[in-house]
Structure formats: C-alpha cells, structure tokens
Design a protein with these regions (language model features):
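Long, charge-rich, low-complexity intrinsically disordered regions
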Residues: 2-155
Length: 155
C-alpha cells in the first residue's frame, strides 16, 4: 500500500479516468491513512489529540491492545460535538477527521506507532505518531505561542 496524500474524491476520479481510458482495475483493499497524511500541522495534531484522548478516556487502557469500535464511535461523536461548540474550529485550517481517519489513528495507537504523551511544560496530554509530517511536539504549547506564550521551535 502506498500513502499518496490524495483525498478519497481525487483517488476515485483517477480510477474513473483510468477505467474510461480502457484500463481494468481491481482494488485489492480500501485505502488506509495514517499519521503521515492525517497529522501534518499543529491544528491537525490538536484535533488528533482531542479525538484520541476522548477515545482513551472512554475505552481505557484496553484501546492500546485492540480497537474498541463502541468507544471509538462515542469518542468520534463527542469530538464532533466539541468542534461545533469551539469558536474558530471551522474552515480549511480545521478540517475535521472522518470516522475512517479516527479508525486509522486508533489503529496506530493500538499498534504502538502512535502514543499519548504528557507535555512537561503545560501538562496536557497529546497524541503523537511516529509517521506524522510535523515536528510539533505539544500542539497546545505551540497554540499558546500564537497568543503570546512560549513556542518551541523545530530543530
């Protein structure tokens, strides 16, 4: 499997174009996204942290061993309810995760490719993936930096 960073709509359009050109394609499996395409900025890291902390709080330590569908679904619904209530979490900069994205993050957490860490500075828990495309450690400290607090720069 190759992670391209393309949206589902773009991939479907490519498939349609190839089929229109006479190629026959057999999809072996559904695409599976991960930290490399989902966590690419401090805003996406804030959202992943919120979603996965809710998931962990609901499912407990068992979510580190297997994906708990009921806990993930409940966390996902709570995540979207919180997004609706927080001013400023709208627009392209704050693109929401879908349920497939939530499953992918939960799978990374289960496999050990991702973890919840506690920031030494602000004591907030945040989600981090070994595959993420951002050097942001604690996204909450970075967000505080935008409002006058200290911000840790990437090395």
């Amino acid at each position: 499997m190759i992670e391209t960073g393309l949206t589902y709509k773009q991939v479907r359009r490519l498939y349609q174009d190839l089929e229109r050109d006479g190629y026959t394609l057999e999809r072996k499996s559904r695409t599976f996204r991960g930290g490399a395409t989902l966590i690419h900025s401090h805003t996406s890291k804030i959202q992943a942290s919120l979603l996965m902390q809710l998931y962990f709080n609901i499912g407990g330590e068992a979510v580190l061993r297997s994906v708990n569908i009921k806990a993930l679904n409940k966390a996902f619904r709570m995540y979207h309810a919180i997004r609706k209530e927080v001013p400023g979490m709208k627009g392209a900069r704050w693109a929401p995760f879908d349920i497939t994205d939530a499953w992918c993050l939960a799978s990374e957490l289960r496999s050990g490719d991702a973890m919840l860490e506690v920031c030494d500075n602000c004591k907030c828990t945040y989600f981090t993936s070994v595959n993420q495309r951002t050097c942001v450690e604690c996204p909450f400290c970075k967000e505080q930096g935008r409002h006058g607090g200290g911000e840790k720069e990437c090395a």
